[in-house]
């Protein structure tokens, strides 16, 4: 519960506790173009009216506290307070509501995702009057988004750097993720790149462990990249994970990558933190490095339907903080991701202007005002039989990443890479010829396997592998 706030000194100070809704529930409010808008899924405790719950969220995530304080009279709360301006029940759910909250732009530090999240979600999620709370979406106004650099380079600049157009990019996470020596790790990188992949990748928890220190890994991977480039005539890359225990150490690793002349580094943006990520993104733009982002820890935050933060919000935050790639689920693989929900936040990552579309979970129209886009990365439990669906779902502006689906090939790493490259080229050609990949995809793969023994072997190994579990987070 919270005060009805009077901001004029002549009124005088009246101590006490009053309902939040008397001050922070304002259904007559017309949102401003400069407001940050939030859509919260609110589950109040029994006996708490939805208007009070929505107002409590607005208050506790902006200027309010649990009781009237005399310093309220020293400022204009009408200028600075958050406002719950609309509440609607969630269809099919009992005692659950979407509360829309508007925040004045002056509440937030320019160019700081850290400050934005500290304000909007930093404290209110532990509020006792709420059984559960989930931040479903944010509208970031151009007046705020223009204070951010955003991705270091973006989709078009990356394609120009790599000289690769008209198809998704292909990647592979090196497995086993832990335990290889740096030299054996570099060998696997070389074999995959030589076989036809565009990128290989450090897994999210590959940092600098006793069995493989980061500098040794960087050196052997750089050697692998240059050797594969010389043999194939294509530009290659390996996502060198710069994530570290301190921001200073992270930057030291990024500097080493730049000195080695490699094209791309990597960061775990949630475990590493938004402040560190934004610093790294600025360095990458200034020094010509692409930045791959892994979302390790995201499911702790976003998987539960009633509590937490939806990934579309984390995706928007990443676009502002900075990254050229980010993992975005696969729809068809082993990791969580319902199709319409996934395509909704994929558009929020890639496009300049995204219309409100509740059928895909997009609560607000978002205008990025020419901020560079981010390539979504499909990774996790995918193999050659998934290639038609992945090509059809994600389109050209994506990275399709096969870890076990490359390194698990019965003939070795390079043949695994060949199989994936052949499958991708076949799917792109079939699509360009007007064939329906959703309906004819398996036939396209079978036809291509007649001319590629590597693809035929991969098709045989993974013909029975499926991950058919219902998504937890559905619209």
UniProtKB/Swiss-Prot annotation:
Reactions mediated catalytically: 2 (2R)-3-phosphoglycerate + 2 H(+) = D-ribulose 1,5-bisphosphate + CO2 + H2O; D-ribulose 1,5-bisphosphate + O2 = 2-phosphoglycolate + (2R)-3-phosphoglycerate + 2 H(+)
Residues modified as N6,N6,N6-trimethyllysine: 14
UniProt KW Chloroplast keyword: yes
EC number: 4.1.1.39
An example molecular function term from Gene Ontology annotations: ribulose-bisphosphate carboxylase activity
Subcellular location: Plastid, Chloroplast
Site (Transition state stabilizer): 334
Highest taxon of the lineage: Eukaryota
Miscellaneous information on this protein: The basic functional RuBisCO is composed of a large chain homodimer in a 'head-to-tail' conformation. In form I RuBisCO this homodimer is arranged in a barrel-like tetramer with the small subunits forming a tetrameric 'cap' on each end of the 'barrel'.
Quaternary structure note: Heterohexadecamer of 8 large chains and 8 small chains.
Record PANTHER family: RIBULOSE BISPHOSPHATE CARBOXYLASE, RIBULOSE BISPHOSPHATE CARBOXYLASE LARGE CHAIN
Record-given protein name: Ribulose bisphosphate carboxylase large chain
Species whose genome carries this gene: Nymphaea alba (White water-lily)
């Amino acid at each position: 519960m919270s005060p009805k706030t009077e901001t004029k000194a002549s009124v005088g100070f009246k101590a006490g506790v009053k309902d939040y809704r008397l001050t922070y529930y304002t259904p007559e409010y017309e949102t401003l173009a400069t407001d940050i808008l939030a859509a919260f899924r609110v589950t109040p405790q029994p006996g708490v009216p939805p208007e009070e719950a929505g107002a409590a969220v607005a208050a506790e995530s902006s200027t309010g506290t649990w009781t009237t304080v005399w310093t309220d009279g020293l400022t204009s709360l009408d200028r600075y307070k958050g406002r719950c301006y609309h509440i609607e029940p969630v269809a099919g759910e009992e005692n659950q509501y979407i509360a829309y909250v508007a925040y004045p732009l002056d509440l937030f530090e320019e160019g700081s995702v850290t400050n934005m999240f500290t304000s909007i979600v930093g404290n209110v999620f532990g509020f006792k009057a709420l059984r559960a709370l989930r931040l479903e979406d944010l509208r970031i106004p151009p007046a705020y988004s223009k204070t951010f650099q955003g991705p270091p380079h973006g989709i078009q600049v990356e394609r120009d750097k790599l000289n690769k157009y008209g198809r998704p990019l292909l990647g592979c996470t090196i497995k086993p993720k832990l335990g290889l020596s740096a030299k054996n790790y570099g060998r696997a990188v070389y074999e995959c790149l030589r076989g036809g992949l565009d990128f290989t990748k450090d897994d999210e928890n590959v940092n600098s462990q006793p069995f493989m220190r980061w500098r040794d890994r960087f050196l052997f991977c750089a050697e692998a990249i240059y050797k594969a480039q010389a043999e194939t005539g294509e530009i290659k890359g390996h996502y060198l994970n710069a994530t570290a225990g301190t921001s200073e150490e992270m930057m030291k690793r990024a500097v080493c990558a730049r000195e080695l002349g490699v094209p791309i580094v990597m960061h775990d943006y949630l475990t590493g933190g938004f402040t560190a990520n934004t610093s790294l993104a600025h360095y990458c733009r200034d020094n010509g490095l692409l930045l791959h982002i892994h979302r390790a820890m995201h499911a702790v935050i976003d998987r539960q339907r009633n509590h937490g933060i939806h990934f579309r919000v984390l995706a928007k935050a990443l676009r502002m903080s900075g990254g050229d790639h980010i993992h975005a689920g696969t729809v068809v693989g082993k990791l969580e991701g319902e199709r319409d929900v996934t395509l909704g936040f994929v558009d929020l990552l890639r496009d300049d202007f995204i219309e409100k579309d509740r059928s895909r979970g997009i609560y607000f129209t978002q205008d990025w005002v020419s901020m560079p886009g981010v390539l979504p990365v499909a990774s996790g439990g995918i193999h050659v039989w998934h290639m038609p669906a992945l090509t059809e779902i994600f389109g050209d502006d994506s990275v399709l990443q096969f870890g076990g689906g490359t390194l698990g090939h019965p003939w070795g790493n390079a043949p695994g890479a060949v199989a994936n490259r052949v499958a991708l080229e076949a799917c792109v050609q079939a699509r360009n010829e007007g064939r329906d990949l959703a309906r004819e995809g398996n036939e396209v793969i079978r036809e291509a396997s007649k001319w590629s023994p590597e693809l035929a072997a991969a098709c045989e190994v993974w013909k029975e592998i499926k991950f058919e579990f219902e998504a937890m987070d559905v619209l």
